[in-house]
Amino acid sequence: MALGHFTMAFPLISELGIGSPESIHALAEPMFFIALGLLILGNGFFKPNISSFVGTFYKQNSELRDRGFNLFYMGINIGAFLAPITCGAIGQDPNLGVNAWHYGFGLAGIGMVLGLLVFMYGLRTGVFKNNGHSPNPKLLNAKIAALRNEKGEYVGGGMTLKTATYVGTFLLIPVIFFLLSFGSKPLLYPWGKELSFLDIILFSMVGYMIYYLSRYGKTITKAGYDKLKVIMLLFFYSALFWTFFELAGSAITVYTETNVNKTVPYLGELSSSQFMGVNPLYIILLVPVFNYIWKYLKRKKIEPSAPMKFAIGTILLGLGFFAFPIGGLFADAGMVPMVFLLIAYLLHTLGELCLSPVGLSLVTKLAPKQIVGFVMGFWFLSSSLAHLLGKFIAQETDAGDLSPVEALETFNGVFTNVGLMVNHNIDN
């Protein structure tokens, strides 16, 4: 991921006097897609494995597991809070000109390197002890490509499954480059909505992984298969939640830019990207509160089950969307007071804390040990599916050249319908 961020900052070489503006411009687009490929692959290694890694520090039925994942989630959001107020502020700084965002990407790369150094320090000093090792190291180190003798035995050097995984990963970069370059073009128009080749791949992948987990479940105990069924069911529930929650990065950000009074006394006007730091700031402040609440309810033997926490979280998410049309009642020339945006983010964050860390903990608890990383990857696929579904909603909020008053009417209608839709699905 660090390489990806530094590649995103590629146009900054012009600041060093390297290359002509024409050559840099010609390479900008291919370098951008290569950078995205590196980020995608890095994220694929990082997100499911770091979450699975945290789960290895707790015994199977430890009551500390959920609280540990809450703290882990708080750590994630410390970074999520710093990103928009640093990289976002730099990217929208008019004094940095056309390369402003590239400075932000470079700063993100430096942050990735610092995180890697901290992790390497933990490995070298034994902080992690023996947690996180492969459940089947013999298979991982088995040779899959080498010379054989007359007995069919591998001899000499060769490539292990572990090495092949790393080599194959880098070979995927041109594949991702092609998919990002050409796979996003619309192919189908079902129900008047655009579906690209990438969208079709995502739907196919969801179907394949459900098929694979169902087949795998038949090779283990009935109890283990039942646990996989729970994960698969909650996968779709999670996708529903994130479909609406992730509008924060699209429709809600456009709403913030177009229809929110962003002026703060003594600070001036904030950028819309800086409001992306509100959600992680709430998480940092509220995680200790949630840990106390769940601990208290458990002690009283009335702690909600994981599915019930999911339902509570989704109800809070739906209520958050009603803050937008209510704020519209107090609008002045189409500009809504900032407090209503902050209330919406607060309710969304409360809902997120009822679902996301609970879901991560649940997956590490229920998934078979041999495939916990794979199942965690499947779990994160719900977020990908949500982004795909969310884009159809975001398209309905395209303000275009509308005035703030006209745009506010559009947003109020969409957000009201989203709030009703979320709570209707809860009833079902």
Name every feature range the model reports, one short phrase each:
Residues 66-91, 104-115, 276-283, 378-394:
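Glycine-rich segments within core transmembrane alpha-helices of 12-TM secondary carriers
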